[in-house]
Amino acid sequence: MLSPKWRRTISRLFLIPQRYVLGIMGLLAVCNAYTMRVCLNLAVTQMVNNTKSQESHYDPNACPDDSDLLVNGTVSSKPHAIFDWSESTQGLILSAFYYGYAITHVPGGYLAERYGGKWTLGIGLLSTALFTLLTPVVVKAGGATWLFILRVLQGMGEGPTMPALMIVLARWVPPHERSRQGALVFGGAQIGNIFGSFMSGFLMAGDGDWANVFYFFGCFGILWFLAWSLLCYSTPNTHPYISDEELKYLNETVTSADTKSVRDPVPWKAIVRSVPVWALLFAAVGHDWGYYTMVTDLPKYMTDVLKFNIAATGTLTAMPYLAMWVCSFIFGWVCDVCVKRKWHSIKTGRIIHTTVAATGPAICIILASYSGCDRYAAVAYFIASMALMGGFYSGMKVNALDLAPNYAGSLTAMINGTSTISGIITPYLIGLLTPDVSIFYIIRVIGRVARWCSG
């Protein structure tokens, strides 16, 4: 631990309090996690050569293709598309990440509570970054099977992300700041989707090699790990250069800021019997069903149904997540203001925002399923859908901090790990329902998925 003199000197170098530095680095952590998670969703459209399937199957309902993929009336081969994978194989590969992701949630939450969130989160994301760098080499050497295994390992590295972040936030953020900080940190998911989609499209535009996508985001993950290791700590009391004023403030306002005392074991029996926990679980499953459908299959929808080229697909795929990110701050600010002015309780605020984030997107996706080849209408519905989903972060996403701040990691691990089943099922299900590359039928599939999700 630094001497008080040096701690005061270093703390003056920061223009903002350390809890906000942590919030920004947490945002970048989630951003980094999501770029490595979603980059394959766009890259796979350029990895697979579906020319043969498109030539052998005529779909009279397909949208007109005016993209640069048409040459003399036929679909040209993609220069770096060296794999011949069926739609079901692609769906299985896209879902592989979530197998590993679900497995390490509970162990990740336990490790974060036992040893602190800093290294649990940092080492997990570092491993995912290294696996991302290796993706081009592995898939060229072992094909779909090796890629599936690698994606499972990537998911295992990212599994502790949310539980570890919840532990860190529970020990750093006062209750009245949690909606805004939650929107800031977990809004990083949308920044990751925006950045990942846009940069993937940019790197693959023209004759760009899809391998560059994995090299770029793998290096980005390693750079984040270096910054996280230097700037962030698990608790305020272990931070070497937090100001005395902020340390005193956090110890007075955050009940779990001091972790020196021995904690009781996680009360799993009480958690499982808790009605609010079950409500939280059902809300998470419903949200993730629609969210993972969008994340994994929106790029394929843009490319194979609406016939956008890869550069346009990258940009247009990013737009709904930009709307979700902006609206997550708006929802978070509104919730905090209403609670602070006692217009409604924290519980009521969580219910309102979760309801908006669940029913609104389902309605918009159903409307998008009937937009047909109207590109502008489809994109508008997707943007509106994700914008309304922004209420999720100030709703049930931070609810674990309210229900059990001392066990937020374990509770988040249970909720996130269980709801990840949606990410396992939806990509493979859509792949099975669209065996031919004429994925115009995916429009109806997405509509049905939304209806199942909304009950």
Q: Language-model features: where?
A:
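Cytoplasmic helix-loop-helix junction between adjacent transmembrane helices
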Residues: 147-190
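Flexible cytoplasmic loops linking transmembrane helices in multi-pass membrane transporters
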Residues: 4-17, 68-85, 240-293, 342-358
